[in-house]
């Protein structure tokens, strides 16, 4: 990575064919999952006319994802990771085919949608954990920051493209097209993934999966560094749940429908800018301190967001949150991968990803509870400033993370 540039260096895609294959597979997978994410709630709403039923499907899928992350972490530390990745992707694609066939029936089954949602949520997250655990072996630990930033850009770009494409498909061909193309895209991802080298795991004693998972929890709690990283990650994800208040806040700002879209686009845009300008982040000597400060700054941006007098200022605050949270997340990812023992990478990546899933759900629930007691403006500002106080306390308490120093890596990627 070029020390003189703040911009992200994409040369890793040229110099590491295995990472290029993962990049391509991940992008196709994100677009495929995005098509699914648009189709499922629309189909359930059309069948039941019940927002509760739509919410139930999201909750069930989220629960299956959480279990899949836990199981995937254990499997990724026990079995050859390439096989786990391929098995998970292929099995997930079978579930998409099931959704497509169900949608083509004269009377689609609601129960089938719920069950296949559980199936796909479980196997999709199982493969994600194995892929995360394999990344250090594919790019080298010295290139993890660069790989993480490129991955973040991939996720953001795919997250923008897939809903638009999904909406067009719904308008022109119905939900069956979304499911069919999601299945096709998932099986296409197997082609680049088949080119990956073997990804064996370090030798370790066979033990009960629950005991193996418990060992990961013990490691997390016993390590002030890794534990602090996981805690910060969960809090940042909780803060991002402020999006549930966008519709109510848009009414107070008297925003048009087109302008409301800018609220939803602001955080991804800020995160993309954060990833693009992360060129020198890998060379920071005190990544823990930068992580803590950027996290507190992101909370402050959320607190200020709702009390802005005009919506444009609110959008700027959200973009600032996206930028600062991207910096924090990139440092979390890199330190987690570099400071976790190889034989525990699968389980720790599973736990780290799971706290992202649960943090978002907890944040949304807390904001919903606050919204029942106070105005949307007060709810957003109280949650943001409350997180600022917690963040400042953690800045003092997490001494090992704050003082952590590293030798800047010398990348061979460019």
From Swiss-Prot:
One of its GO terms (cellular component) is plasma membrane. Keywords: Cell inner membrane, Cell membrane, Membrane, Transmembrane, Transmembrane helix, Transport. Pfam families: MFS_3. The keyword DNA-binding does not apply. It is a multi-pass membrane protein. CDD domains: MFS_MefA_like. It is found in: Cell inner membrane. The keyword Transmembrane helix applies. Residues 43-55, 105-109, 178, 240-256, 308-313, 378 are periplasmic. Residues 1-21, 77-83, 131-156, 200-218, 278-287, 337-356, 400-414 are cytoplasmic. GO terms for molecular function: efflux transmembrane transporter activity; enterobactin transmembrane transporter activity. Its main location: membrane. The chain crosses the membrane at residues 22-42, 56-76, 84-104, 110-130, 157-177, 179-199, 219-239, 257-277, 288-307, 314-336, 357-377, 379-399. Component of an export pathway for enterobactin. NCBIfam families: PRK10489.1. Belongs to the major facilitator superfamily. EntS (TC 2.A.1.38) family. HAMAP family: MFS_EntS. This is Enterobactin exporter EntS. It comes from Salmonella typhimurium (strain LT2 / SGSC1412 / ATCC 700720). The gene is entS.
């Amino acid at each position: 990575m070029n020390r003189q540039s703040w911009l992200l260096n994409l040369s890793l895609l040229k110099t590491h064919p295995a990472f290029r294959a993962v990049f391509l597979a991940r992008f196709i997978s994100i677009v495929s999952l995005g098509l699914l994410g648009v189709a499922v709630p629309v189909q359930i709403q059309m069948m039941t006319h019940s927002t509760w039923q739509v919410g139930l499907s999201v909750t069930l899928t989220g629960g299956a994802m959480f279990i899949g992350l836990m199981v995937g972490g254990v499997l990724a530390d026990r079995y050859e990771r390439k096989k786990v990745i391929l098995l998970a992707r292929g099995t997930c694609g079978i579930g998409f085919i099931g959704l497509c066939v169900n949608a083509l029936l004269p009377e689609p089954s609601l129960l089938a949608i719920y069950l296949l949602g559980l199936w796909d949520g479980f196997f999709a997250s199982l493969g994600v954990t194995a892929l995360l655990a394999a990344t250090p072996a594919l790019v080298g630990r010295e290139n993890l920051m660069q790989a993480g930033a490129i991955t973040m850009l991939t996720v953001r770009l795919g997250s923008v493209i897939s809903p638009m494409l999904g909406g067009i498909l719904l308008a022109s061909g119905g939900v069956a097209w979304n499911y069919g193309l999601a299945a096709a895209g998932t099986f296409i991802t197997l082609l680049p993934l088949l080119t990956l080298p073997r990804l064996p795991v370090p030798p370790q004693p066979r033990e009960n999966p629950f005991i193996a998972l418990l060992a990961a929890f013990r490691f997390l709690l016993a390590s002030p560094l890794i534990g602090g990283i996981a805690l910060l990650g969960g809090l940042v994800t909780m803060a991002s749940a402020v999006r549930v208040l966008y519709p109510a806040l848009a009414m107070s700002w008297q925003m048009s429908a087109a302008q409301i879209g800018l609220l939803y686009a602001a955080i991804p845009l800020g995160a993309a800018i954060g990833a693009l300008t992360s060129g020198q982040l890998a060379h920071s000597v005190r990544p823990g301190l930068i992580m803590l400060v950027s996290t507190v700054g992101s909370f402050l941006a959320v607190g200020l967001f709702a009390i802005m007098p005009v919506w444009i200022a609110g959008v700027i605050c959200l973009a600032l949150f996206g930028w600062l949270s991207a910096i924090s997340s990139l440092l979390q990812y890199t330190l987690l991968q570099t400071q976790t023992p190889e034989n525990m990478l699968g389980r720790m990546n599973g736990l780290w990803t799971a706290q992202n899933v649960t943090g978002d759900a907890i944040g949304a629930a807390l904001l919903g509870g606050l919204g029942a007691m106070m105005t949307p403006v007060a709810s957003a500002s109280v949650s943001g400033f409350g997180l600022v106080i917690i963040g400042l306390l953690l800045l003092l308490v997490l001494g090992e993370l704050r003082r952590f120093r590293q030798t800047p890596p010398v990348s061979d990627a460019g």
